[in-house]
């Protein structure tokens, strides 16, 4: 239509006013073209009558919530909840910033804005109910009364108390652990605040609540290595020490004990004074006597089985054994049951019958011991003082190597056998009373010492009363031993080993 009109106007244009008429016609043509492109012709006028009504559907509404805490709950962590609500309702929701009024501004179509408004108000009411339940339970705890039952039928609320130091462990990083427990058990768990008691409130169905409590306790056990007892009498568990030995008690218990009577190491251990030699075994044997504070010896805890378990926690090879295994000892625990024969205690060493007197210093270290090899006695390398001797004389620990040292080339087996036989005969012929037996043993020992005294291997005049360190050869008098040590390069005349000092042997 516009092109034909333009052709007609060109054909009809004439005269002086034709130029103006042509310009007017061209302007009219351009206007008609623009109107046709915009669709404002009469045929389509009815379709655009509703255009103002379509634009009026987009609207903006303000939705107010009670507090800024409600805003934080509705927005969610890093805006995750509000983003989901925007996508669900196809609206734009402007969240209030901190310090402003808690009002959400929702923009969109009318029905979408109404849906977003209902969602926001529902979330705010739900959070208000949760806050009211928390305040009610807190008031019940402070008032000492029983918490009110939950609103929903069939649900129950329990309290799970944990130690203060594991509250953060149960909550987890950014609440991940407690959320996982809630999702797995289908419960709602209220975590304790910093200024309240360490009690988790678990709400849900009874079986789900029990599962949640078990999950919390299991998580604490896994992360700390063992179950934590919060009883007042168990202060070791309360302050965070000795946790986790219950699971591995079989590794530390005595080998001869049955599994039914076995106890954890946390109940059978030395305190901070164990380095000073306190080793109480009352908790292990179930006795009520006072603790025996004599020093524990690794050699006294020798076990004759192959797993090398002992009560003191020391582990030694099977080659370390007492000298004479055919002797019996009386128990060191009067009111309690007798311990296994493989676990000797230090007190039994002091109470063994017929043994020579021992000289102890303040630290309980055996100083002067004389051990003689006899019938039925087997010698083995030792890491600690011997358990007992052959009812005879004791020898210094550094000087007794001459008895079993083949490098020295000097053997006194005849003298040793004579000493053991004489000592055994004197003890067997003594009376049944302990006093007469000990006096007979001491007299025979003193007589044997005078009879078997030796002369110095250098001067052949004085009695042998000195030994060289570290080789331990006791073949010299004190004067000759000192002269050996005073040389420029002191060495033992027997084994030619370096000598650091000479010690006097007291019998």
UniProtKB/Swiss-Prot annotation:
MF-aspect GO terms: RNA binding; zinc ion binding
Residues in KH domain copies: 59-120, 155-216
Pfam families recorded: KH_1, zf-C3HC4_3
InterPro entries for this protein: KH-I_MEX3_rpt1 (IPR047228), KH-I_MEX3_rpt2 (IPR047226), KH_dom (IPR004087), KH_dom_type_1 (IPR004088), KH_dom_type_1_sf (IPR036612), MEX3 (IPR047227), Znf_RING (IPR001841), Znf_RING/FYVE/PHD (IPR013083)
GO cellular component term of the entry, any: P-body
Gene3D superfamilies on file: K Homology domain, type 1, Zinc/RING finger domain, C3HC4 (zinc finger)
Keyword terms, alphabetized: Cytoplasm, Metal-binding, Nucleus, Repeat, RNA-binding, Zinc, Zinc-finger
Top-level lineage group: Eukaryota
Entry's free-text remark on domains: Binds RNA through its KH domains.
Protein name, per record: RNA-binding protein MEX3B
Taxonomy of the source species: Eukaryota, Metazoa, Chordata, Craniata, Vertebrata
The encoding gene: mex3b
């Amino acid at each position: 239509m516009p092109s034909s009109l333009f052709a007609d106007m060109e054909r009809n244009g004439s005269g002086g006013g034709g130029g103006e008429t042509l310009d007017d016609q061209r302007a009219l043509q351009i206007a008609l073209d623009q109107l046709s492109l915009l669709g404002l012709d009469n045929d389509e006028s009815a379709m655009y009558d509703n255009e103002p009504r379509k634009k009026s559907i987009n609207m903006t509404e303000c939705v107010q919530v009670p507090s800024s805490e409600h805003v934080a709950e509705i927005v969610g962590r890093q805006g995750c909840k509000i983003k989901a609500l925007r996508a669900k309702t196809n609206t734009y929701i402007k969240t209030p910033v901190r310090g402003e009024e808690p009002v959400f501004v929702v923009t969109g179509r009318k029905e979408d804005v109404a849906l977003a408004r209902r969602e926001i108000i529902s979330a705010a009411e739900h959070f208000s109910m949760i806050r009211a339940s928390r305040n009610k339970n807190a008031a019940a705890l402070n008032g000492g009364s029983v918490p009110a039952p939950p609103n929903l039928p069939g649900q129950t609320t329990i309290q799970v108390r944990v130690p203060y130091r594991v509250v953060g462990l149960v909550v987890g990083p950014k609440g991940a652990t407690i959320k996982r427990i809630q999702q797995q058990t289908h419960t709602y768990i209220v975590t304790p605040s910093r200024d309240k008691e360490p009690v988790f409130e678990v709400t849900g169905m009874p079986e789900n609540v029990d599962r949640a409590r078990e999950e919390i306790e299991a998580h604490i056990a896994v992360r700390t290595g063992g179950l934590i007892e919060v009883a007042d009498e168990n202060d070791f568990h309360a302050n965070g020490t000795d946790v986790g030995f219950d699971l591995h008690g079989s590794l530390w218990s005595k080998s001869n004990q049955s599994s039914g009577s076995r106890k954890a190491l946390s109940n059978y251990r030395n305190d901070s004074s164990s380095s000073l030699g306190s080793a109480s075994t009352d908790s292990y044997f179930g006795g009520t006597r006072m603790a025996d504070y004599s020093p524990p010896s690794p050699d006294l805890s020798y076990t004759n089985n192959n797993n090398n378990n002992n009560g003191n926690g020391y582990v030694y090879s099977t080659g370390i054994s007492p000298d004479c295994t055919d002797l019996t000892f009386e128990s060191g625990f009067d009111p309690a049951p007798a311990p296994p024969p493989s676990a000797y205690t230090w007190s039994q060493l002091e109470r063994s019958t017929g043994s020579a007197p021992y000289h102890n210093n303040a630290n309980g270290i055996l100083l002067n011991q004389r051990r003689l090899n006899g019938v039925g006695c087997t010698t083995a390398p030792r890491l600690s003082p011997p358990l007992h001797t052959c009812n005879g004389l004791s020898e210094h620990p550094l000087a007794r190597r001459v008895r079993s040292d083949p490098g020295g080339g000097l053997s006194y087996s005849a003298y040793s056998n004579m000493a053991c036989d004489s000592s055994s005969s004197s003890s067997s012929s003594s009376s049944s009373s302990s006093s007469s037996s000990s006096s007979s043993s001491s007299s025979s020992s003193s007589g044997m010492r005078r009879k078997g005294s030796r002369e110095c291997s250098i001067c052949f005049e004085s009695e042998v009363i000195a030994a060289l360190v570290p080789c331990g050869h006791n073949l010299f008098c004190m004067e000759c031993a000192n002269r050996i040590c005073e040389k420029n390069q002191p060495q033992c005349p027997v084994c030619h080993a370096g000598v650091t000092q000479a010690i006097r042997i007291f019998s």
